[in-house]
Amino acid sequence: MKDVIIIGLGASGISAAIYAKRSGLDVAVINFGMPGGIINTSSIVENYPGIKKITGSDLAFNLFDHFNSLNIPLYNEEVIDIIDGEIKKVITTKNEYKAKKVIICSGRKPKKLGIKNEDKYIGRGISYCATCDGNFYKNKNVCIVGGGNSALESALYLSNICKKVYIIVRKDKFIGDNSLIKSIQNKENVVIKFNTIIESINGVDYVESIRTNNEEIDLNGIFVNIGYEPSINILKNLNLKMDNNYIIVNKNMETSVKGIYAAGDIIKKDLYQLVTAVSEGAIAATNVFKSIKE
């Protein structure tokens, strides 16, 4: 049995693991997916103190490298349930793990478009990560769906790889940073489509075109950047207090269930940023340590 099990290895999970290990706790991490979480989807990170500019994938690598240096047990398994009790149980598709405390850092996942045949084309023209899959569309026509910073960053990244990049925006304007908007407007191979929604996706085995409310556009790739939603599948049996599917925590990062903590993008808060996720992971681990030692 462990002192604490951390679920997830994004920024908050890595931070929690580092602080737990350094405080002397017997800690293990369970993660399913890429270490670093959604940091990997950022083409460039420029707002993390001490690092002027770095790619998201490089920052994720650095965080994971720090984690690995501490020899913390890592189980690459998918968590399917958490069972409360004096001893907490974390159930994966392969094993059952026990701990005194649990820190949930499962983060968020990209929102889907919610249109017919979307799942059919995932990996066959639909992607939710430009930096992960952009190179598959070199010299091809693609579209970005979304009007915020992540969509603009993805469009800039793809404009250097793809022949033409359409930006499909539901509203009549962008809601991103002015510097990003200006950079987009200076790109000759970027076409902006305001007041536009995708109504259908067409193609036999792979994406060949999209039908919008205005026209049909021939393209090979659709990159969806319309925001994120919390990953809550593992929470079904915990009866946690929630707010719009986000976990409510107190100042110590403890949930409404004693001994269950949460940090990062899975919790209800005002600011969803890398720097806040790292802080919350540290706070959660520190308070787990205090609780166990008391």
PLM segments and residue spans:
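Phosphate-coordination loops involved in phosphoryl transfer and adenosine-cofactor binding
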Residues: M1-D3, N76-E77, K138-K140, N195, ...
